[in-house]
C-alpha cells in the first residue's frame, strides 16, 4: 500500500471524525481500509455487506467531501466487501482471493465461504454434532456414513455441512463435493424427466465423492424424489462415498418418509443440535462482533443473550439491529438503547415462550392430576394418556430434544416420547374429542 494512499486516507478520516459521534465513527468509519487511489476512483475495503449498505446510504457523501477538501478532486467511492487481512494482496489480486477456501470447480461455489469449522462457535448444545462433522471431514466414508444432523431452524446445521465440504476440498482439492438442498434435488429431477435427461441427472449425483443434502424432510410425500434419492444413496454408499444429511427432525419423525429411506438414514450416526445455552450465546455474539469489527459493550451482549434464546440467526440479527439503531439515532450503544431497539422482537418472543413446565402444569390441571403424576412411573390410563398428550405438546411447542423431553417426564427414554407423539398424532386424525382437548390445551398454554 503506497504512503500517499495511507496518508490521504488518514487525513480524510480525521476530517470525518469531527463530523460524527464517537459511536458512529467507531462503528462505521474505523473498519474501513483503503485499497487503491487511481485517477478519479477511490477503492475502500469494508468488512461486510451490511456495513457497505450503511456507508453507501449515509456516509458516502461525507467521505467524498472530506477527500475533496484535501485534494480538490471529487472521487468516485467504491466500497469493496473483503475479509482479507492483507489489503495489499487484495489490491493486487482482488478477484482471486478466496479467504483460504479452495475453489476448484463449479460445485465448490455452492459452499458459503463464511461457513467453516474455524467460524463455528462450539458449546454444549452443538459439541457432539461438531465433533461428528469434523470426524467425517477428516476421514470421509470411514468414520460415520451417513452422518445425519438434525435440529431446529437457525442452530447451525447448514454451517456444519458447508464446513465439512470446505475442509474436504481444502485437504483434497480433487474431491468431487456436491451440496444441494432437497428442494433443488427435486426440481432438478423434475427438469431431467421433462427434458429427458435422466442419465445426466444420475451421473451428476452418483459419480461424486461427497454428497451433502440439506433439509431432507422436504422430500417427504414426494414418491418419485424418494425413489430417485433411494437409488442415489445406494449407489454412493456401495461405492464407499460419504453422505451427509440435515433435517429439522430425526428420521423417525419425518412424516410419509419411506421406511427403506428411514432405515438407511439410521445406518450411520445421528447427531442433534439444540438451542444454545447462555455461555454459547455469549460466545456467538462476541465472535460476530469480532468478525464484523463491532464495538459492543459486554453488558449489552449479556442483555441480548438473556433475552434471545432460540437460535443463532436471531441472536446475530439482534446484534446488527442494535448497531443500526445506534447509528441511525446517533445514540451510544447501551442496555437502554438495546431494549428500545429490540422491544418488538423481545415482547413477541416473550408472549410465545412455551416451556415443558408450563405444558405439564396445564395438562395436569386439565385432567385433575398432579404434575408429579405425569413424571411418575404409574401407567394407569387416567395418567398414561395425559402424560402422552403432554409429551406430544412438548414436542410440538418447544425446541427441546427428544432425550430432554423424556428426562422432564421422569427420566423416560426418547423412544417413549416418539411413541407418545406418534400415538397422539394418529389419534388426532380420527378422534374429535381429542382434537377439542388439544385445542383447549393450546389455548390455556398460550394464556400462560
Curated annotation (Swiss-Prot):
| Keyword ATP-binding (UniProt) | yes
Q: Mainly resides where? A: cytoplasm
The protein's GO terms of the molecular function aspect are: ATP binding; ATP hydrolysis activity; DNA replication origin binding; lipid binding
One matching Pfam family? DnaA_N
Q: Where is this region: Domain II?
A: 73-109
- Domain notes from UniProt: Domain I is involved in oligomerization and binding regulators, domain II is flexibile and of varying length in different bacteria, domain III forms the AAA+ region, while domain IV binds dsDNA.
Q: How does it assemble?
A: Oligomerizes as a right-handed, spiral filament on DNA at oriC.
Which purpose does this protein serve, as stated in its record? Answer: Plays an essential role in the initiation and regulation of chromosomal replication. ATP-DnaA binds to the origin of replication (oriC) to initiate formation of the DNA replication initiation complex once per cell cycle. Binds the DnaA box (a 9 base pair repeat at the origin) and separates the double-stranded (ds)DNA. Forms a right-handed helical filament on oriC DNA; dsDNA binds to the exterior of the filament while single-stranded (ss)DNA is stabiized in the filament's interior.
Name of the protein in question? Chromosomal replication initiator protein DnaA
Q: Which gene encodes it?
A: dnaA
Amino acid at each position: 500500500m503506497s504512503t500517499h494512499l495511507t496518508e490521504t486516507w488518514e487525513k480524510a478520516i480525521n476530517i470525518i471524525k469531527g463530523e460524527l459521534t464517537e459511536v458512529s465513527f467507531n462503528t462505521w468509519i474505523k473498519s474501513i481500509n483503503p485499497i487503491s487511489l487511481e485517477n478519479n476512483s477511490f477503492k475502500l475495503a469494508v468488512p461486510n455487506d451490511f456495513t457497505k449498505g450503511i456507508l453507501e446510504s449515509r456516509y458516502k457523501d461525507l467521505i467524498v467531501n472530506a477527500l475533496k477538501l484535501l485534494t480538490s478532486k471529487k472521487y468516485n467511492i467504491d466500497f469493496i466487501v473483503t475479509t482479507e487481512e492483507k489489503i495489499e494482496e487484495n489490491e493486487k489480486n482482488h478477484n482471486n482471493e478466496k479467504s483460504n477456501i479452495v475453489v476448484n470447480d463449479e460445485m465448490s461455489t455452492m459452499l458459503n465461504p463464511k461457513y467453516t469449522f474455524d467460524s463455528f462457535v462450539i458449546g454444549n448444545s452443538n459439541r457432539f454434532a461438531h465433533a461428528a462433522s469434523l470426524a467425517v471431514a477428516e476421514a470421509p466414508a470411514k468414520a460415520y456414513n451417513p452422518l445425519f444432523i438434525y435440529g431446529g431452524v437457525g442452530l447451525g446445521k447448514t454451517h456444519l455441512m458447508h464446513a465439512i465440504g470446505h475442509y474436504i476440498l481444502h485437504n483434497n482439492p480433487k474431491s468431487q463435493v456436491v451440496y444441494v438442498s432437497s428442494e433443488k434435488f427435486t426440481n432438478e429431477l423434475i427438469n431431467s424427466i421433462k427434458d429427458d435427461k435422466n442419465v445426466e441427472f444420475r451421473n451428476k449425483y452418483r459419480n461424486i465423492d461427497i454428497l451433502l443434502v440439506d433439509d431432507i424432510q422436504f422430500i417427504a410425500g414426494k414418491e418419485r424424489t424418494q425413489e430417485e434419492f433411494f437409488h442415489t444413496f445406494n449407489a454412493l454408499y456401495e461405492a464407499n462415498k460419504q453422505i451427509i444429511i440435515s433435517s429439522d427432525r430425526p428420521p423417525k419423525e419425518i412424516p410419509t418418509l419411506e421406511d427403506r429411506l428411514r432405515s438407511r438414514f439410521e445406518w450411520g450416526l445421528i447427531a442433534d443440535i439444540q438451542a444454545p445455552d447462555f455461555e454459547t450465546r455469549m460466545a456467538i455474539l462476541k465472535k460476530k462482533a469480532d468478525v464484523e469489527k463491532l464495538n459492543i459493550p459486554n453488558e449489552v451482549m449479556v442483555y441480548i443473550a438473556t433475552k434471545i434464546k432460540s437460535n443463532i440467526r436471531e441472536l446475530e440479527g439482534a446484534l446488527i439491529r442494535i448497531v443500526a439503531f445506534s447509528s441511525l439515532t446517533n445514540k451510544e450503544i447501551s442496555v437502554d438503547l438495546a431494549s428500545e431497539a429490540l422491544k418488538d422482537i423481545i415482547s413477541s418472543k416473550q408472549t410465545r415462550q412455551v416451556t415443558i413446565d408450563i405444558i405439564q402444569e396445564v395438562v395436569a390441571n386439565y385432567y385433575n392430576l398432579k404434575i408429579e403424576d405425569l413424571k411418575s412411573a404409574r401407567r394407569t390410563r387416567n395418567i398414561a394418556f395425559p402424560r402422552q398428550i403432554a409429551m406430544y405438546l412438548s414436542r410440538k411447542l418447544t425446541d427441546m430434544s427428544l432425550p430432554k423431553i423424556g428426562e422432564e417426564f421422569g427420566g423416560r427414554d426418547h423412544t417413549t416420547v416418539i411413541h407418545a407423539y406418534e400415538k397422539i398424532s394418529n389419534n388426532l386424525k380420527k378422534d374429535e374429542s381429542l382434537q377439542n382437548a388439544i385445542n383447549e390445551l393450546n389455548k390455556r398454554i398460550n394464556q400462560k
